[in-house]
Amino acid sequence: MITFPCAKINLGLNIVSKRKDGYHNLETVFYPIPLTDALEIKLMGDEFPSDVPCDLKITGNAVDCDEQNNLVVKAYNLLAADFRIPRIHAHLVKRIPSQAGLGGGSADAAFMIRLLDERFRLNIGNAEMEKYAAKLGADCAYFISADPEDGDTACYAEGIGEELMPVSGPGDNLRGYHLVVVKRDDIAVSTKEAYAAITPQAPAKCCRDIVRQPIETWKEELVNDFEAPIFKMHPELAEIKQKLYKLGAVYAAMSGSGSAIFGIFKHKPANVEEQFEGMFCKIMKL
């Protein structure tokens, strides 16, 4: 059985306060996009035995961890502690760039939970699956319901990203637009340093309300608080954002804590890959 974990972009990201546990409260809108990995599972037979209950093989983009520390295996182990799940082989094909703010690892974990639930008829239910996913990462829970073909599965998130509420507006606003995602492979963003450089404060207007407005208003109001400190550390990322605007984007921003930058275009831009030669550059229709 195979599934296709999807990436997300953040439409606005505001760091509103620091918590007593050291984490930060945030406000953001998660929006699913049709950039996917591929994840397949098969029952482990006698002809291909393994010493581990979830034997994971990763191909495609490089991932900076060994297979048994991957979130896909952790998702299996989490459910296997509560349910009788057979030993399996899993194959993950990575196409979503890592350390990009696109949620690729979180999506893989959540879609593994979804896949195990469907394949082995665990009947967990979305609400419980979200609770399991949240144990693996702050934004993992979102991907339990995310559908890259349905912008209405966008969610407004609070807390550390695990408190989810449906949000109306962005699905209708973005339908038919084109998305360009750009990432430089030579830039790794330190989220810890980025948080350290931010002074938390509540925004003048919540991103949940801004995304309901016409997209033409987003440029002046929809803000990712991480951009200021991270662009200061890596001015090349600010240059990518400005280039997307020069190419005709109606809105451009960094996703999450970076380092991917995206631009939203009313019409498909021409020759955009040539403008970002040597970088990951993907164009997709929303």
Indicate where each model-derived feature is located.
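ATP-binding N-lobe of GHMP and related small-molecule kinases
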Residues: M1-A100, D117-A127, A154, D172
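ATP-dependent small-molecule kinase catalytic core of the GHMP/sugar-kinase superfamily
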Residues: I2-P5, G12-N14, K18-N25, L122-V250, ...
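Residue-level signal for inorganic ion chemistry
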Residues: L11, L39-I41, V72, G105, ...
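Short, basic/glycine-rich phosphate-binding loops at helix/coil junctions
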Residues: E47-C65, M112, A134, P214-V223
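Short, solvent-exposed beta-strand edge segments and adjacent coil->beta transition regions
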Residues: P53, Y177-L179, G258
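Short, hydrophobic beta-strand segments that form beta-sheet elements in well-ordered domains
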Residues: V73, I261-F265
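Glycine/serine-rich anion-binding loops at beta->alpha junctions
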Residues: H91-F120, A138, V250-F262
